[in-house]
Structure formats: structure tokens, C-alpha cells
Amino acid sequence: MSSISSAPQQQFSLRYHKASISYILPISSRYIYSADQSGLVIKWDLQIRRPKLQWQAHKDSILTILQWHQYIVTHSRDSTIKVWLEDILQFEMPVNALNYTNIVLYRDNYLITPATLDSNNVDVYKLKQHPIEVSRVIANISIFELVNKTRTNMHANKAGDGVDINVKYADEFAIDDKDNMQGRQDFGIIMKMLVIDMTIYIGFESGDIVGLHLEVPESKLTRGSNSTLLINREPRLKLEYQNTLLVPNPVISLANLNGLLVSGSTGTKVVIHSDPTRTVKFHLSGIHSIQTYQDRLVIGFWDGAIEYKGEIIQRPLPQIKGGLDINSNGDDENEEENLKSNVKLTSMTLSSFGNSSGSDTAKVQHVRKPKYSEMVKAKSMSDALFAGYEDGTIMGYALI
């Protein structure tokens, strides 16, 4: 009796990009946006598997696509952030752009970016819709200095100086362990950012991960006998969390697992930031992307492999077989190394719309066990894993 494979099942492919896929953003069960290293953006209609809209949004690789109300926000290595209504440009601003770092929205009206002056630091912008306005409210804040300052205050608190600081550290990271920070001048450049609930997580080149909370004080209204004064206090970032388990490997992937942070690096280790933290090791290195589905991890590796429920799928490059290589020196080991040619994974995301909880499938199970084809069909549009590759192809997979 053969068992059904739990590996992601290919449902369709989307082919139009000529350059490597750099970002994929699902906005509904029917539409996704994709971007590539040339700066092209495509809005896909998944019902017909064709582009509905396409435009040259930037002159270089697009690092981030965000949905902000009715707008689409794009962030590129050409050092600009642009706001679009469909393919019509509504707003543009200069911004620092690094090789990997994305930008994130916070509470839908703040934008967190790498700092313009220093790639290791952070800028925070406040967004307004009507008309679109962007104002910088926090400039060039050093997270490394914020961590050091908070640690100093925590030591003062332990000494009885009355400083009230509450920061969650990884269980392997003790407040009194000075070796964790001694001799280090910085965390390096920002590599990845992710917002979970009210916490902004930032992964650094050093392997450090920091969690921040953006405090937005309420405006204070002061009334006098002849006048009324509105006092606006500026937002500030407060340290909530730090983890050093991935040091010294750069953080290249962050994900949300039911409210818990999951992180991966250039190494083989994935950290689940529960209490206490859990570490999962894989046989492949380069944790390019982490997605979560029904309490399980979907791991995309640099070399193109995708692992889910212990099974791996890959897209091998076409190979010419049976020919005689007159230049071959008979070294089978080198020959095998040269044939290790999978299409490189460059972007991966999971869409969960409509039947994302699987409730419809659960109802059917009370009557009879659904056929595998029915399960795949039910989930192919609502729950889909989208994998973008260096050859410009986007593959749609169903997860069972």
C-alpha cells in the first residue's frame, strides 16, 4: 500500500519575468504581485495564470513589496521607495538600500527602514494617506547603542538604583555575561526585519536579533484662559528582546509561527524563539526563507531545495547526458560536483486566504475521507506556496 507524499505538490508555474525573482506578495486568493532584479513588477491573476498588469517600477532589484491600504509600496536597490495605485506612481522618496534588507510597516502608519546615514542603524517614518505624506520621526538610531544602554540600566537596576527596565533575553544569554558584547563595536548591517504583533524584530549581519517596541506617546492638550496648546511628543524605540544564538552567522530569514519568532541564517540552524528557545538543525546550509503552515516550518535553502515535513523538492537544471567529454580527466568527484545544478531559490512566500484554516476539508472528513485530488484542488488557490527562482519562474505548490 503506497503512502501519499507530504512534499509540496506542484500546481502551476508563472513565466514572464526575464530576471531573477526578488519578491512575491500575495494580496488575495486570486492576485499576487511579483518583482524581479530588473525592477519589473507584475500583478498576476491566478485564475487565468496570466499577468493582469506589469510595469517597470524601478531601475534595480526590488527588495520589498508592501500593501498599504489601497496602495502598493515598492522598495528597491536603486535607493527609492515608491507608492503606487495600480501602476500609477503616487509618491517617491529616497532611502538607503542594502543587498538584503527589507522594509516593514508598523501599525499601518509607520515605516521602518535602514538609516540613510548609517546602514547599521534605523530610521522611522510616519505615513499619512490623504494626501500621501511621509515624515521622519526617528533618525539614525543605533540599535547596538540602545542595547548597550539598556544593559547598563539593567545592571543599575540589579544594583538597586531603581531603574525600571524589562527586557527578555534568550535563556543562553545572561545579563551578567559581558563576553557577549565585549570587543564588539556594532552588530553590522541590518539583514532582515519582521513585525509580529507590536514587536519589530531586526536580524543583523553579526547574527544578533533584537526586538523593539515603538512607543507612540499620545498628544497632550493644554488649555489656558485664552489659548489651547497641543503638545506632540515624539515616538521612541524601546528594547524588548535580544538573542545571540545565530552569532556569528548573518541572519537572512525571519518568520512568524503563531506569534513566535523563527529565525535562520547562512548556517544550518533554525531558532524558534519560544521560552525556552528551541533549535532545529538541517543538513543544508543557507536558510534563505522560512514560511509557516499549520504549526510546521517550510524551509527554503539557497541552493534551491525546499523542505517540508522532512521531504525535499528541487528544480534541477537540465543536463546534457550521454555525450563524451574529450576534456574529461576521469575525475568522477569533480564531475559530480559540476553536475550539482539546481535552479537557485530567490524568493518564497505562503498565501493563506479563504480556506486557510482547512475548515472546509474538516467538514468533508465527517462524511468520507477526501480524495487527494480534492484536497489539492481545494487548497491550490487559497493555501499556496509560491517559490521564485533565479530563472524568473514562479512555481505554485499545494501543501497537504
Swiss-Prot record:
Predominantly, its location class is nucleus
Cellular compartment(s): Nucleus
Q: Which superkingdom does the taxonomy of this entry point to?
A: Eukaryota
Q: Does the keyword Acetylation apply?
A: no
What keywords are annotated for this sequence in UniProt?
Chromatin regulator, Nucleus, Repeat, WD repeat
The annotated subunit structure for this chain is: Component of the ASTRA chromatin remodeling machinery complex.
Primary role: Component of the ASTRA complex involved in chromatin remodeling.
- Name by which UniProt lists this protein: ASTRA-associated protein 1
